[in-house]
Amino acid sequence: MTELVGRTRARCVETLSLDSTGTRNALSAALVAELSAALAECGKDPDVRAVVLTHTGTTFCAGADLRDPPDPDALVALLRQLIELPRPVVARVTGHVRAGGLGLLAACDLAAASATASFAFTEVRIGVAPAVISLPLLPRTDPRALARYYLTGERFDPAEAVRLGLLTVTADDVDEALAPVLDGLRRSAPQALAETKRLLTARVLETFDRDAASLTALSARLFSTDQAREGMTAFLERRDAAWVV
């Protein structure tokens, strides 16, 4: 069976690489399950000080796999797992991030992207809403600034992602930018990192507790509609949806 998540370790930092380039690292049921299992192991391993979440290929994550979508509850659980993991999680992006991939990005504690990265909330263009991924996104960003991209599906660049609060830093050389960050995490006490992360994520988890059930239901309802079926079919057939004017 092909592994969908690569794993390496260097000086107590575990790197998890989304490795399903044939689907542009789309969130399939299998990839979500494998990533969740890897995170669970990292959370229990005392030799893991921090986790880097990155990717192979030119796309960090294309969002949900429309041919093999994950269960909405499983996606909520994965996002919550990233937030509750007692290790800092650092996103390292050198490519495109779309739709559900932005949920992964928002669930990480820190995020860095190279100048080649691009971002888009493409849900509205296939007839649905960025429902489940709003759980980590809206508490960590400026909703007013985010509204343009939520409502239009426009692409935006790393500098704009920093302004919105999606990214911590952008640089031509993302590894050079992350080097002092990872060094700082290696110098920090494990219990201090865990408790400091709890302080930083408390408000995000309140949103999960309050809204996860309703947003999961909204997502399921929207994906079952005629407009969503048309939008997904149009996407797979590489044509405009019927409502485009």
What are the functions of these language-model segments?
Residues 149-150, 161, 199, 203, ...:
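Helix-loop "lid/cap" segments that line or gate small-molecule binding pockets
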Residues 95, 109-110, 148, 152-154, ...:
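Well-ordered beta-strand positions
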Residues 82-126, 158:
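Glycine-rich beta-to-alpha active-site loop
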Residues 112-117, 167-213, 226, 242-245:
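C-terminal long alpha-helix characteristic of the crotonase
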Residues 1-56, 179:
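Conserved CoA-thioester-binding segment of acyl-CoA-metabolizing enzymes
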Residues 134-144:
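Hydrophobic, secondary-structure "cap" segments at the distal end of domains
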Residues 47, 54-82, 207:
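Glycine- (often His-adjacent) and acidic-residue-rich active-site loop
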